[in-house]
Amino acid sequence: MARSIKKGPFVDDYLVKKVEKAKASKDNKPIKTWSRRSTILPDMIGLTFNVHNGRAFVPVYITENHVGYKLGEFAPTRTFKGHKGSVQKKIGK
């Protein structure tokens, strides 16, 4: 179920302050965050966020297409190694 329109998008307060500070100072340093649950707002376009995926920080550059999504959607937490195949398939026989 989607979030109610009357509530508005969720963004952590500290993250909004960091975005405003970065926009005011024209700073190109990435903003480090653990807040994967925050929604990407139009104010964030052009900024780079380092989003934590549980192990490392993944750089995410925000464009217009990202608006409305969550930060965590662009920092995958699981690595897919592929399905196990037989040895003959790998050799090519």
Curated annotation (Swiss-Prot):
It comes from Helicobacter hepaticus (strain ATCC 51449 / 3B1). Protein S19 forms a complex with S13 that binds strongly to the 16S ribosomal RNA. SUPFAM superfamilies: Ribosomal protein S19. Keywords: Ribonucleoprotein, Ribosomal protein, RNA-binding, rRNA-binding. Pfam families: Ribosomal_S19. One of its GO terms (biological process) is ribosomal small subunit assembly. This is Small ribosomal subunit protein uS19. Belongs to the universal ribosomal protein uS19 family.
